[in-house]
């Protein structure tokens, strides 16, 4: 039997990963390690999908016990603090969770199961702001994160790289665009605005440059498919971008949501501008040709986003 550890499995992306992967690989055993943060929910994971262990990724004794108990074949490390706004308020918490937490997991496996397969889930934000028309590739030499969340994830990646080179651990890293779909906590743009509009409230947009700020949104099913492909076909030590081909400005996606959910084109009625972040990257433009060569493609389109908004 293949034993799999999934960290943060009650969160948004990881819960969808568990639900989809268990259906695809019913004979695999999944252990879900999650301390159930405010944005996580046990009910996100379908009954019978995984064994839930409530605990912290920084608890080395617990990790050691789990490794000895289950002798894991692979780790999918999703657990992370991810809300950028919160990272401005408490940057240290993000460093402790995302960078130090990753270090504890890696070190515990190095000591107890160094040959484990390890998939590290990161973010496009480690690249920093895109200021040219050339997309970032995995070979981009310098990471320039501009907010505490992105910096904590970049720091985690540096630790990952050191374990690849120093200890020859089998690790693959994934950097992903913005994701939407079921189980997402309503603090990120799409679920937040969807909730506000259904309640008859206004969407709150940071700053006044929303026409210049662009994001690429992907459905979580496409992301889970990419993670599965990286696991099965990716090379150890490599990094893979998961990028959407459908980039849209914040103001455009907000107007799309308003029209889809309310039926109105009186956009001013449903939009209010609030104070901008200390720094707000205008764009994360990344390339996923490396992943596409493994056979991945984006199946969900903007039409699927519209259908998701209608639900």
Locations of the language-model features?
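Residue-level signal for the nucleotide or nucleotide-sugar donor/cofactor binding architecture
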Residues: 58, 89, 97-100, 147, ...
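Hydrophobic alpha-helical packing elements
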Residues: 13, 62, 94, 152, ...
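Non-catalytic, surface-exposed connector residues within folded enzymatic/regulatory domains
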Residues: 88, 170-173, 187, 251, ...
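N-terminal Rossmann-like NAD(P)+-binding domain of SDR-like oxidoreductases, especially those catalyzing
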Residues: 1-179
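C-terminal substrate-binding subdomain of Rossmann-fold SDR/epimerase-dehydratase oxidoreductases
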Residues: 19, 197-311
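Glycine-rich, flexible loop/turn motifs
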Residues: 41, 84, 132, 138, ...
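Structural element of the ATP-grasp superfamily
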Residues: 105, 160, 193, 291-292
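NAD(P)-dependent short-chain dehydrogenase/reductase
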Residues: 10, 130-135, 158-231, 254-260
């Amino acid at each position: 039997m293949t034993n799999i550890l999934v960290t943060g499995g009650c969160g948004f992306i990881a819960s969808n990963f568990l639900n989809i992967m268990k259906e695809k690989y019913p004979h695999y055993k999944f252990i879900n390690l999650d301390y159930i943060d405010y944005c996580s929910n046990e009910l996100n994971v379908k009954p019978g999908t995984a064994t839930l262990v409530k605990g912290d990724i920084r608890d080395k004794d617990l990790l050691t016990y789990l490794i000895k108990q289950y002798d894991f074949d692979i780790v999918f490390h999703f657990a992370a603090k991810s809300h950028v706004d919160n990272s401005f308020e408490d940057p240290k918490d993000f460093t402790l969770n995302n960078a130090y937490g990753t270090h504890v997991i890696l070190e515990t496996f190095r000591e107890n199961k160094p040959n484990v397969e390890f998939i590290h889930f990161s973010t496009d934000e480690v690249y920093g702001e895109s200021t040219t028309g050339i997309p970032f590739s995995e070979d981009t030499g310098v990471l320039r994160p501009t907010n505490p969340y992105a910096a904590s994830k970049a720091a985690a990646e540096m630790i990952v790289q050191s374990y690849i080179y120093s200890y020859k651990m089998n690790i693959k890293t994934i950097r992903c665009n913005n994701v939407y779909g079921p189980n997402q906590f309503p603090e990120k743009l799409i679920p937040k605005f969807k909730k506000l509009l259904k309640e008859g409230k206004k969407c709150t947009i940071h700053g006044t440059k929303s026409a210049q700020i662009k994001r690429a949104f992907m459905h979580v099913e496409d992301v889970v498919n990419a993670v599965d492909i990286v696991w099965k076909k990716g090379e150890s030590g490599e990094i893979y971008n998961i990028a959407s081909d459908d980039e849209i400005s914040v103001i455009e996606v907000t107007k799309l949501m308003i029209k889809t959910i309310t039926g109105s084109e009186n956009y001013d009625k449903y939009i209010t501008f609030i104070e901008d972040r200390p720094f707000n990257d205008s764009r994360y433009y990344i390339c996923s040709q490396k992943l596409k060569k493994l056979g991945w493609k984006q199946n969900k389109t903007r039409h699927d986003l519209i259908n998701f908004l209608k639900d």
